[in-house]
Structures are given as structure tokens and as C-alpha cells.
From Swiss-Prot:
Name this protein carries in UniProt: Peptide methionine sulfoxide reductase MsrA/MsrB
Disulphide bridges, residue numbers: C68-C71, C440-C495
A biological process from GO: protein modification process
UniProt catalytic activity: L-methionyl-[protein] + [thioredoxin]-disulfide + H2O = L-methionyl-(S)-S-oxide-[protein] + [thioredoxin]-dithiol; [thioredoxin]-disulfide + L-methionine + H2O = L-methionine (S)-S-oxide + [thioredoxin]-dithiol; L-methionyl-[protein] + [thioredoxin]-disulfide + H2O = L-methionyl-(R)-S-oxide-[protein] + [thioredoxin]-dithiol
Amino acid sequence: MKHRTFFSLCAKFGCLLALGACSPKIVDAGAATVPHTLSTLKTADNRPASVYLKKDKPTLIKFWASWCPLCLSELGQTEKWAQDAKFSSANLITVASPGFLHEKKDGDFQKWYAGLNYPKLPVVTDNGGTIAQSLNISVYPSWALIGKDGDVQRIVKGSINEAQALALIRDPNADLGSLKHSFYKPDTQKKDSKIMNTRTIYLAGGCFWGLEAYFQRIDGVVDAVSGYANGNTKNPSYEDVSYRHTGHAETVKVTYDADKLSLDDILQYFFRVVDPTSLNKQGNDTGTQYRSGVYYTDPAEKAVIAAALKREQQKYQLPLVVENEPLKNFYDAEEYHQDYLIKNPNGYCHIDIRKADEPLPGKTKTAPQGKGFDAATYKKPSDAELKRTLTEEQYQVTQNSATEYAFSHEYDHLFKPGIYVDVVSGEPLFSSADKYDSGCGWPSFTRPIDAKSVTEHDDFSYNMRRTEVRSHAADSHLGHVFPDGPRDKGGLRYCINGASLKFIPLEQMDAAGYGALKSKVK
């Protein structure tokens, strides 16, 4: 507690620490005004949000969107929590952000939500997403805990269950990882699942406050966590790392969407903000804990990192001193270090985090791994086989009708010639000749290759009337079809989850057994 108070005072009065004394780079101070901003807003039923905000309680906020199926499936559960006496020690509210992150415009959202039946769910509307932006909320659902004094105490990305929510209210530093939850189906699934097709790399580049905040701003990064890596002791504290020579490096665990970013992309972003020739020093921070390094868990990544280092070396006369090593250990830093620059908007940082907003030149992508199929019969494999061969996201989407995040799959912006087949059975479904950029965030087509390859079903969920599209052979959930497509091409828009598909490039169609369909592409 003494150590935390020391850091709080330094953040408040601008102290320069002997260890971790960073050059000042002021970040968005909006996080400090979250309580005031909340109190000025109204709910979806036009009540003052202040009705739900008692000053003597912490506030637990759930951020959600109308286009997020997981969010919609949890509305009833969240409404029950808001009425449950177990949650009476906190203000429990939800925030929707019309006009932000592809949410409906304010009027359209109000009209849409009025058709739902959650009369006891506090839904505060923040037009433009001022609060979400100030807290770096980039995925839904996400949660934020605001203390009694108005300070941001914790941000959690993804779905949490009741036990986790209560633990968070009791202790902002609670270890939520020990309480299992499922991302897609929290009521039925028994094991954790990943938000997207995620991969993880560990980056050491000086003071982890700035590096964490920097990567949180990058589109395609799902999460960034500060911690201590590759040291000689277990479960070190900040004091251990700083004063007791444990050998750990301040490191950020970066989890990213591999369908949007490759490891090489991540490394390009990394080298933008570190001096790779500086040994045990970044900015004003000096010591072995501030050394630079890239630590991997997949041996195949060593060569990728080596190639990036070789390319980077060409920019410098001095030799690079960035470690390229396997991850030996990693321990999360104390909770007060997590999201530090959000909790302390005037805190110091040795890098310019605005560089995260600059696009990469020649951005590369990581292609999804291919899956096998029976080209002769297009039969659906057994459930055990599907769980073995599909990613968690592919399984949840095709088998449990889940939906991937909008703009999250590389197929949304893939327009190379070829065909798209059912990832489950290999059945041909759509051609690149019929694909177009609808702007909705999911791969869109004007028609299937063969009308008989898909089936249509009424879907009345979430106060909507939609037409679900499934594959014929394997009955895989694909997406929905809407009557708002290009008029000159039939007027239909097949809005399809990229996770349901496998792309076969034109030049590979013969070898893959689809040569007879090349005329559908050309």
C-alpha cells in the first residue's frame, strides 16, 4: 500500500522517479472526467443517468453494442445483476455509444432499443462514444470499474461471469483469470475460448506503462498486459524487479488478432518506439529491467523475429541489442500498473503513443491455416473431429451460430480471385466474382455460386426479423442475407462470417479439386 501511494503521489505531482523516470508525453485526459461525463448523460428511456449513480459507491460499467451478438445474449443476465442484492454495493450500468465503433446513429439506436424488453436494465447512451474512447475501449463487451472517488480502477476486455463481476467489485485487483468463463456461450460452454483468432507475443521496451498504452491503440490488438518476463525468481513484485536484481524485464504481453495483424506487423510497430541500439536503457529509464527484447512461445516465430531484426539493423550503424529469445516465464505486474496511463492521464511515458495511429507501410497479413475436407461428398465431420481441426472461433460460429466481430476478419477486405468454401465440409459457396465491399464489416456477396448450396431460415432474435443463411451439406451457420445489396446485381447482400469460410485462390483451384468451378471466378 505504501508503494502504491508513492506512485499515486508521483502521478499527481509529476515526480521524476529514479527508476522509471520517463520523458513527459501527455495522453488523453478524458479518462479523468468519466464520472462527470456519465452524470450529464441520459438513459435510453430518457432518464438522467445520475439516477443510477450513487456517490458513495463504485461504478461498474459494461460497454456493449447492438451489432455484438454476445452482448445481446447477455442483456437479460446483466439486467438480473442490476436488480440482484449481491450487486448492491456498486452502481451497475451499461453504456451504448451511438455513432462510435459502427454503432447505429443515436436516433436509430433509441428506436431499435425501444423495441426490446429490458425495462430494468440501465442503458446510458453516450453519443459519439466519448467515454469509450477515453478508456481505449475497442472491443465489445468490455467492462470498466470506476472507484468511489472517480478514479479508473480496472478495465476488462471481453465477457465476465457473475463471480468475476462480484470479485471485481470487492477488489479491483482481483485475479479474474482464476474464474473460468466462456466468451461465446457463457451459459453452456465449460472451457475458456479466445475472442478471435488470437496470437500472443511478449515485448520488452523500457517502461511498460507507455508500451502497453501504445499497443492498446493499435487496430487489431485485442489486449496488452504489463508484466515481468524472463527473470530468475517466481512471482516478483515491482520492488523485487527494481531493487533485488531478479533479472526480469519490464514486458508487455500483446495479444493480437492474427487475421488483422501479422507478427511482422507487430514488430514494425514495436521498432517505431524503441531504440534497438540502446543497452539496458530506454528514454530516461536505466537498468537491466529496461532492456529490449522479443520473447516468443512458438519456436517458428524465432526466424520471423530474426528477419525483422536484420531488416531493422540496416537503419543503424551501431549493433542492435534486442533479445530474440523464447519466453521462460511471465508474471502479470501489479494491478496498479495495468492501464496505468488511463488511470493516470497525466502520467509520464517515454514514447509517443500517437505513433500507433500511423498506418504501416506495406502492411502484411497472416493467412489462416487451411482445413481438410472431403471434396467428393462434402460430408460434415464428427463433432470431435471439428473440435480438433477448427479454431475455437470457427467452431463457435459454424456450430453454435456465434458471430465474429465486425471488421475483424481478413476476408472482409480480401478481393483476390478465387472461391469461398464451407470451412466445415469444403462445399463451394461463394465466388470472388460476386464479392463486393458493402462496408458492413463482414464478407459480402451478391449471390452464392449455386442457390442450392445454401439454405435460408427465419431469425427473430434481438427484436429483428432476419434471414439466416446456412450451408446445405454441413448445416454450418454462415450469416444472414439482406435485401439491400446492389440493385444491378439482384439487390441481395449475403453477409457472411469469415470464420465460416475457407478461401481457395484461383491458381490453387485445380490442385484443390475445384477446377470445374474456375469459370465461376473468371
